[in-house]
């Protein structure tokens, strides 16, 4: 038997791209995403997408469709990444660029007080514990973690350094200071594969991994010589998040062959900035998503026919 794993990358407001692609898959299969996949993994904004698709309603069915998550980005993207000039200026030296309160408001609005146990499928969210120097995974199938509130797990996986403050949680009597899982697994497909092999040891595995778009942006040698400690931060984060995508693609491509399906492309018109929430950029991101669907038409159609 084949088990299907969904993996969704991080990328801030660019999370609208995988949400649109998943809405297309729900439309073609006439099935909710949580019914198609046996394990669903997400990092950062990808965590919001997958958790939204796994959240149960009162009848035990999916609370949100992928289109509902598209609407979330359109309605609340600019609210989450709302800042003021003074805060941005201070953030270069001390503190995060954006207030966590806006993000937490949106997470509470969509996920309430529900815990990881109140989800469908097997859900995996990534984060990194900067206090204990180790990755930390939120897994709804683990009894020692499934009573953590979804909004707290999502606050942790979206705590991108310099953008939002870390999330403090006490879990099983251990103090944890958690930040965005993108610092080690911006594409969480390998994390999903490892968990899938443990959960389904006797089954074949197929992974659908959806990206949020990449950029050609580089750091030229002449520019890098002039960067100081402070101005290195954002470019370094871009390199760190981007390099992990390439590594996972190579590794899973070698191990799984055509059982690893990757939908990703270079952004052609939209901004790569994770906090660019202008109306124009959101419109451009939606257009990028449609181009990704068009460019991967055969892959998507074949996958939908198999799982429908």
Over which residues does each language-model region extend?
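Conserved catalytic cores and adjacent C-terminal regulatory segments
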Residues: 1-308
């Amino acid at each position: 038997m084949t088990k299907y794993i969904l993996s969704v990358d991080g990328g801030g407001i660019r999370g609208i791209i995988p949400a649109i692609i998943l809405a297309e898959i729900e439309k073609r299969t006439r099935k909710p995403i949580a019914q198609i996949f046996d394990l669903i993994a997400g990092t950062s904004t990808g965590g919001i997408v997958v958790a939204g698709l796994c959240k149960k309603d009162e009848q035990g069915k999916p609370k949100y469709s992928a289109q509902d998550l598209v609407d979330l980005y359109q309605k609340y993207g600019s609210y989450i990444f709302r800042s003021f000039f003074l805060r941005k200026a201070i953030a270069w030296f001390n503190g995060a660029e954006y207030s966590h309160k806006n993000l937490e408001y949106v997470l509470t609005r969509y996920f309430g007080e529900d815990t990881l146990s109140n989800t469908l499928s097997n859900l995996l969210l990534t984060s990194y514990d900067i206090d204990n120097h180790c990755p930390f995974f939120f897994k709804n199938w683990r009894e020692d973690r499934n009573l953590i509130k979804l909004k707290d797990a999502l606050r942790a996986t979206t705590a991108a350094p310099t953008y939002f403050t870390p999330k403090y949680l006490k879990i099983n009597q251990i103090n944890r200071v958690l930040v965005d899982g993108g610092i080690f697994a911006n594409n969480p497909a390998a994390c999903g594969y490892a968990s899938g092999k443990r959960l389904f040891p006797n089954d074949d595995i197929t992974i659908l991994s959806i990206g949020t778009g990449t950029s050609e942006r580089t750091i030229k040698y002449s520019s890098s010589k002039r960067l100081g400690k402070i101005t290195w931060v954002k470019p370094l984060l871009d390199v760190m998040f981007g390099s992990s995508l390439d590594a996972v693609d190579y590794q899973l491509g070698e191990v799984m062959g055509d059982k690893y399906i990757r939908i990703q492309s270079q952004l052609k018109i939209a901004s790569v900035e994770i906090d660019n929430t202008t109306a124009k950029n959101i419109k451009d991101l939606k257009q990028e998503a449609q181009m990704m669907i068009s460019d991967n038409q055969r892959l998507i159609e074949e996958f939908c026919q198999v799982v429908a």
